[in-house]
Amino acid sequence: MTKQVEIFTDGSCLGNPGPGGYGAILRYKQHEKTFSAGYFLTTNNRMELMAAIVALEALTSPCEVTLSTDSQYVRQGITQWIHNWKKRGWKTTDRKPVRNVDLWQRLDLAIQTHVIQWEWVKGHAGHPENERCDELAREGANSPTLEDTGYNPD
């Protein structure tokens, strides 16, 4: 039987761009694991993507996942936009390179073995897991330790 897993994610940036962090909660039955990290210079969208990527990459076998995010960018990107980006060689409709392509490609790879239901939750609206992820993300942003080597200000 396929494991049923819940993932909650959030990203934060102090300035955009600026120091940023992500937070994620992975829940399987009564077990819970949290993920958090901070980057010296990044964007909020990159941190939203990283939260989902890190949690999904932690899964060791195919799972049925409900992933909750307050980022429409992540949810729409992975459920709608990515299909045409891939068809166009990772270009947008106006033939420009997709922003954050390194992370979109990593997320695309991370979802391959799972069945994922992407859910949007309103941020800062009292959703307990989203609030906890927001805290984790802000903690990371307030004490960054990593370089976001894929961040490319353009």
UniProtKB/Swiss-Prot annotation:
For molecular function, the Gene Ontology terms on record are:
magnesium ion binding; nucleic acid binding; RNA-DNA hybrid ribonuclease activity
Location(s), subcellular: Cytoplasm
Gene Ontology cellular component annotations, sorted alphabetically: cytoplasm
Keyword Nuclease attached: yes
Show where the RNase H type-1 domain sits: 1-142
> What cofactor does this one take?
Mg(2+)
Q: Where does Mg(2+) 1 bind?
A: D10, E48, D70
Note the superkingdom of the native organism: Bacteria
Keywords on this record? Cytoplasm, Endonuclease, Hydrolase, Magnesium, Metal-binding, Nuclease
Give the E.C. number(s): 3.1.26.4
Q: Which reaction does it catalyse?
A: Endonucleolytic cleavage to 5'-phosphomonoester
Span-the-membrane segments of this chain are none
Cofactor stoichiometry and binding remark: Binds 1 Mg(2+) ion per subunit. May bind a second metal ion at a regulatory site, or after substrate binding.
Alphabetical list of CDD domains matching this protein: RNase_HI_prokaryote_like
Q: Which Gene3D superfamilies match?
A: Ribonuclease H-like superfamily/Ribonuclease H
Q: Which residues bind Mg(2+) 2?
A: D10, D134
BP GO annotations: DNA replication, removal of RNA primer
Report the sequence similarity comment from the record.
Belongs to the RNase H family.
> Can you state the subunit structure given in the record?
Monomer.
Q: What does it do?
A: Endonuclease that specifically degrades the RNA of RNA-DNA hybrids.
Name of the protein in question: Ribonuclease H
Recorded source organism is Yersinia enterocolitica serotype O:8 / biotype 1B (strain NCTC 13174 / 8081)
Gene behind this chain?
A: rnhA
